[in-house]
């Protein structure tokens, strides 16, 4: 028997379950389980990756100054209030590590991103789940759950896996209603899919209790490189940088992200295609008796009659080489989360669901 005992609480942490990428016995699959951009990264980002290959023997920047400057220029933000990480997950981890510990509580919502309770437990804090209202964040429920032990509120807007979104006015009401010892963390992983939405940046600029995170994994198509960033008051950024590894991002990551964020024409193209096929996919599935809430992200949450039908449909889709995401772990056992793919992928999903429904009729 292993004589080494981990710190208390570590074995209570559930392993994160990512989207499937393979189906046994199926050679060619269409992966629609991880909310990846079907158009991939900007050609400028691809070229930046190639250009950095010959410099792999050189250590990267420790302060990410060029990437922070590019992000600041594109979004109109102060680069000194930006921190970069290995995906936005790492920035979220910095926040939990820096501001929570044993005896503290971290609020997340009923169908919120599964990393939030994991990050809380990693820091020794206690995750507190609050109910949503018809798969939409309930600000009043969050405020009612806050107490003297609360330190963080994690909020994804748009949300994953529901795709729903609350208004900027509601987010502001939440920030205004939190006591001074609580930080509001706005996870804007899908913010770019909403044209004109700043992900909460203006709220961060105006207050000292709000943090925003963003990622290059979704609309920028760089999920395989793992790059994210956060925007917060300078005092908080200073704290987070003290627990950040100095070389946490490689030269390739930094160059690709800088090229990607500067290519906003590519972002607009990806957003427009996603909007077109998200609308089409949701409408066609609704016609087949599979409704979904209005999504503001790059996926839809397709709802079936019950868990049995959802799981049966998932297996049917897999038999046709279509990989989507079961979300029972998000307290949504009767639903499947389907990434908005390209035209061929969306049409294949609708054809398969139609065949599934006809076979069960």
From Swiss-Prot:
Pfam families: Aminotran_1_2. It is an enzyme of class 2 (transferase). InterPro entries: Aminotransferase_I/II_large, HisP_aminotrans, HistidinolP_aminotransfase, PyrdxlP-dep_Trfase, PyrdxlP-dep_Trfase_major, PyrdxlP-dep_Trfase_small. It comes from Ruegeria pomeroyi (strain ATCC 700808 / DSM 15171 / DSS-3) (Silicibacter pomeroyi). Belongs to the class-II pyridoxal-phosphate-dependent aminotransferase family. Histidinol-phosphate aminotransferase subfamily. This is Histidinol-phosphate aminotransferase. Keywords: Amino-acid biosynthesis, Aminotransferase, Histidine biosynthesis, Pyridoxal phosphate, Transferase. One of its GO terms (biological process) is L-histidine biosynthetic process. It catalyses: L-histidinol phosphate + 2-oxoglutarate = 3-(imidazol-4-yl)-2-oxopropyl phosphate + L-glutamate. Pathway: Amino-acid biosynthesis; L-histidine biosynthesis; L-histidine from 5-phospho-alpha-D-ribose 1-diphosphate: step 7/9. The modification N6-(pyridoxal phosphate)lysine is found at residue 218. Homodimer. Its cofactor is pyridoxal 5'-phosphate. Its EC number is 2.6.1.9. One of its GO terms (molecular function) is histidinol-phosphate transaminase activity. HAMAP family: HisC_aminotrans_2. Gene3D superfamilies: Aspartate Aminotransferase, domain 1, Type I PLP-dependent aspartate aminotransferase-like (Major domain).
């Amino acid at each position: 028997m292993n004589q080494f005992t981990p710190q208390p609480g570590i074995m209570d942490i559930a392993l994160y379950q990512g989207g499937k990428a393979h189906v046994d016995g199926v050679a060619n699959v269409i992966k629609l389980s991880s909310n990846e951009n079907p158009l991939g990264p900007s050609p400028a980002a691809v070229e930046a990756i190639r250009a950095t290959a010959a410099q792999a023997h050189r250590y990267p920047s420790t302060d990410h100054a060029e990437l922070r400057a590019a992000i600041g220029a594109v979004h109109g933000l102060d680069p000194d209030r930006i921190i970069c990480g290995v995906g936005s997950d790492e920035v979220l981890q910095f926040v939990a590590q820096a501001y929570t510990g044993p005896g503290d509580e971290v609020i997340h919502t009923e169908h919120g991103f599964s990393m939030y309770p994991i990050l809380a437990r990693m820091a020794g804090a206690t995750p507190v789940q609050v109910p949503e209202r018809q798969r939409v964040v309930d600000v009043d429920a969050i405020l009612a759950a806050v107490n003297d032990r609360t330190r963080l509120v994690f909020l994804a807007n748009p949300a994953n896996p529901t795709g729903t979104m609350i208004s900027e006015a509601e987010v502001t009401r939440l920030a205004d209603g939190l006591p001074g010892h609580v930080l509001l963390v706005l996870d804007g992983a899908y913010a770019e899919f909403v044209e004109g939405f700043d992900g909460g940046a203006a709220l961060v600029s105006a207050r000292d209790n709000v943090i925003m995170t963003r990622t290059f994994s979704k609309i920028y198509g760089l999920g395989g490189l793992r790059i994210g960033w956060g925007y917060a008051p300078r005092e908080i950024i200073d704290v987070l940088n003290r627990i950040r590894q100095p070389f946490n991002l490689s030269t390739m990551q930094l160059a690709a992200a800088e090229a990607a964020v500067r290519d906003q024409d590519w972002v607009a193209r990806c957003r427009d295609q996603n909007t077109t096929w998200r609308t089409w996919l949701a409408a066609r599935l609704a016609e087949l008796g599979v409704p979904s809430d209005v999504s503001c992200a790059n996926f839809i949450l397709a709802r079936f009659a019950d868990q049995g039908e959802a799981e049966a449909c998932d297996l049917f889709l897999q038999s046709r080489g279509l990989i989507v995401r079961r979300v029972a772990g998000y307290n949504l056992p009767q639903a499947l989360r389907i990434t908005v793919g390209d035209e061929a992928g969306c049409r294949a999903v609708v054809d398969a669901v139609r065949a599934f429904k006809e076979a069960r009729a």
